């Protein structure tokens, strides 16, 4: 069991249309593409389901060889296509609750802490069901950059990011 505040923080911060899409968020994809074309700050458009696909099936290989490794845009297109296909298959095979639970149990929280149970123990010496809303927000905030937002090594960065996540939960 996990404190529902964790899932609320996760959805409100990482994938606000989680319950409305089928694994791919066209609005997010369009917004990210528009930002990239206009040279604005890059933002992620991956849904929680796409991130689960990446976590479970290692869609993104660190080692690209041949043509794929030499043409970054082609590499990105192939990677995203794989993520989209797997995400849609996950959405047809599992419920939203199962998907978000699988994600929570596989995501990397840094410091070799994979999954919410290990992260809750590592960072707060507690169980996922006993996390406070602040602790849940810190863990979700870390997902953006686990080292930069690590509460042990970068407490100020973690505090600022936690506040952003808490704000997302209120709006």
Predicted regions and their residues:
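Peptidoglycan glycan-strand catalytic modules in the bacterial/periplasmic cell-wall system
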Residues: 1-171
